[in-house]
C-alpha cells in the first residue's frame, strides 16, 4: 500500500515510552501521529482532528480502552480501531472483537506486524 494521502493515527497509551515507540514506528513510513495518554485526551483529539485509525491500549486510567472506543465511535462512526494489551486474557480479547475492534494485538508488538495490521485496516476502510 502506498500512502497516497497523509493518514492520521491516534495512539492512546498511558505509558509515555510506548507512545513514543509507536511514533518512532509510524512517522518514518509517512503517517501523521497524534498521541494521547488517556481516554479523555483521545476523545478530545478525535473532536479536534481528522483521525483515520486509532491504536489504543486496553488498560487506561479512568476510561478503559473499550470505553474510549465506544465514545470515539459515537463521534467518528466506524473508525478502524486496533486495541493493544499486555494481558493474554481471552475474555478481554473476545469483548474487544465483539465491540468491533479491527484487531487486538498483544504487547510487545513487533514493528512489522503493527505496520502490516494498520495498513490492512486502512486499505479496508479507505
Which residue stretches match the model-derived regions?
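Active-site beta3 strand of CheY-like receiver
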Residues: 49-55, 60
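Acidic catalytic/metal-coordinating carboxylates
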Residues: 38, 64-67
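Alpha4 helix (beta4-alpha4-beta5 surface) of REC/receiver domains from two-component response regulators
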Residues: 67, 88-104
Amino acid at each position: 500500500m502506498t500512502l497516497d494521502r497523509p493518514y492520521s493515527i491516534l495512539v492512546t497509551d498511558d505509558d509515555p515510552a510506548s507512545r513514543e515507540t509507536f511514533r518512532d514506528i509510524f512517522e518514518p513510513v509517512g503517517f501523521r501521529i497524534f498521541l494521547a495518554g488517556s481516554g479523555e485526551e483521545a476523545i478530545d483529539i478525535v473532536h479536534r482532528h481528522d483521525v483515520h485509525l486509532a491504536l489504543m491500549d486496553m488498560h487506561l486510567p479512568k476510561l478503559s480502552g473499550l470505553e474510549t472506543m465506544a465514545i470515539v465511535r459515537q463521534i467518528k462512526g466506524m473508525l478502524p480501531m486496533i486495541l493493544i494489551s499486555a494481558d493474554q486474557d481471552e475474555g478481554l480479547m473476545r469483548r474487544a472483537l465483539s465491540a468491533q475492534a479491527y484487531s487486538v494485538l498483544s504487547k510487545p508488538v513487533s514493528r512489522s506486524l503493527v505496520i502490516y495490521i494498520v495498513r490492512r485496516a486502512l486499505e479496508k476502510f479507505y
